[in-house]
Structures are given as C-alpha cells and as structure tokens.
UniProtKB/Swiss-Prot annotation:
It is found in: Mitochondrion. It catalyses: D-threo-isocitrate + NAD(+) = 2-oxoglutarate + CO2 + NADH. It comes from Canis lupus familiaris (Dog). Keywords: Mitochondrion, NAD, Oxidoreductase, Tricarboxylic acid cycle. Signal peptide: none annotated. Its EC number is 1.1.1.41. One of its GO terms (molecular function) is isocitrate dehydrogenase (NAD+) activity. GO terms for biological process: tricarboxylic acid cycle. This is Isocitrate dehydrogenase [NAD] subunit alpha, mitochondrial.
Length: 13
C-alpha cells in the first residue's frame, strides 16, 4: 500500500 494504510484485509494491498 503506497498510501496511509488503514486496516484493510486485502492480500497484495
């Protein structure tokens, strides 16, 4: 994740 990462349960984020 190239951003402010919140709790996102997505593989490959």
């Amino acid at each position: 994740a190239i951003e402010v990462q919140t709790v996102t349960l997505i593989p490959g984020d």
